[in-house]
Amino acid sequence: LKKFNNFSKIRVKNFNAHKSFFKKYKELFITPRIFEKVKTNFLAYPIIIRENNYFSRKDLQIYLEKNNIQTRPIFSGNILRHPAFNKLITSRNKLNGFPNSDYIMKNGILIGCHQGLSVKNIKYIHDIIYKFIKKLD
């Protein structure tokens, strides 16, 4: 707990750096909304690839990983599709499906913003994503 306040400050700083960077690319990515009076210590920064783009989550994920940037899918899929949820899901929900959850599963990715990342690391992540986007032109 002694390190918590410092870790929290670093995570918020890294989160805000990502937020500032991705603000320039609203047409490509959906980014998190933060609500007033809610304090979150993000371990990772979620981004969702918008529909009708020239690339997929997989394309971006492979590019980042090839450039030594670790990524994760948002969650590990649509948890509502797990067999354990079969009895909890109503037939109405099965009929309508879970399009938003499926979309996030297919198009969502997490990039780091934890306290282990330095300003230099965050800048590197942004530089690599910028290069990826420029390759689309």
Q: Each predicted region: which residue ranges?
A:
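PLP-dependent aminotransferase class I/II
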Residues: 1-137
